[in-house]
Regions:
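Sequence/structural signature of long amphipathic alpha-helices
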Residues: 1-198
Length: 198
């Protein structure tokens, strides 16, 4: 199982920006859409905080596999720190959702509904972070190194299977880090939608 920092580093790292886009395209578009990935992070977060997983609804394999693919996004995102911001007046639906989601929305309604934007648009990023997702990613890696974020995510994946609490008063820090991971996922997705050469 690719569960340690060293083994994941070998298997999941991206050598350059193009490889990062290949990884993001696979994880965030081929496997499932962004809203599903946010739910998967939420499932791991719930397991960490509640210490009781309903394995009839959530299999151990799904937690492990989802966690590994999110690791790939974390590794890829290190290459996404230098993209330009978009001006507020030029921001459109094509800057927020990939063509597959846009097509799904069009099938649901000829006009873009506010509910569709709420369902498929970014939920965790601030307005400034939506306009400049690279700035968020840069701040993410200024807060902690890639190695520390990887270790943190692997720790969360492990804790999802614990039956007893290991918080020791760190709940606030854990919640903040889960929010950061959700934001990183959304920021990486926005850069993929706007700038992918694939």
């Amino acid at each position: 199982m690719e569960n340690t920092f060293r083994s994941c580093r070998r298997a999941f790292r991206c050598k350059n920006q193009y490889e990062a886009f290949v990884t993001l395209n696979y994880v965030l578009q081929s496997v499932t859409d962004i809203s599903s990935w946010l739910k998967k992070i939420g499932t791991i977060q719930e397991a960490v905080f509640n210490h009781e997983i309903d394995f009839e609804k959530t299999s151990p394999d799904s937690l492990l596999y989802s966690g590994q693919l999110i690791l790939k996004v974390i590794y890829a995102s290190i290459h996404l720190q230098e993209f330009p911001a978009i001006e507020k007046k030029s921001l459109g639906w094509s800057h927020l959702a990939d063509s597959w989601i846009q097509k799904r929305c069009k099938n649901e309604s000829e006009t873009l509904l506010p509910l569709q934007i709420l369902q498929y648009g970014p939920k965790n990023l601030s307005q400034e972070e939506i306009l400049d997702p690279s700035a968020f990613i840069k701040a993410f890696y200024q807060k902690q190194s890639l190695k520390k974020w990887i270790k943190r995510w692997n720790r969360f994946r492990e804790m999802a299977f614990y039956r007893d609490s290991t918080f020791d008063g760190d709940e606030g820090a854990y919640l903040e880090d889960f929010t950061c991971f959700k934001k990183l996922l959304e920021a990486s997705y926005l850069i993929l939608v706007r700038y992918s050469p694939i």
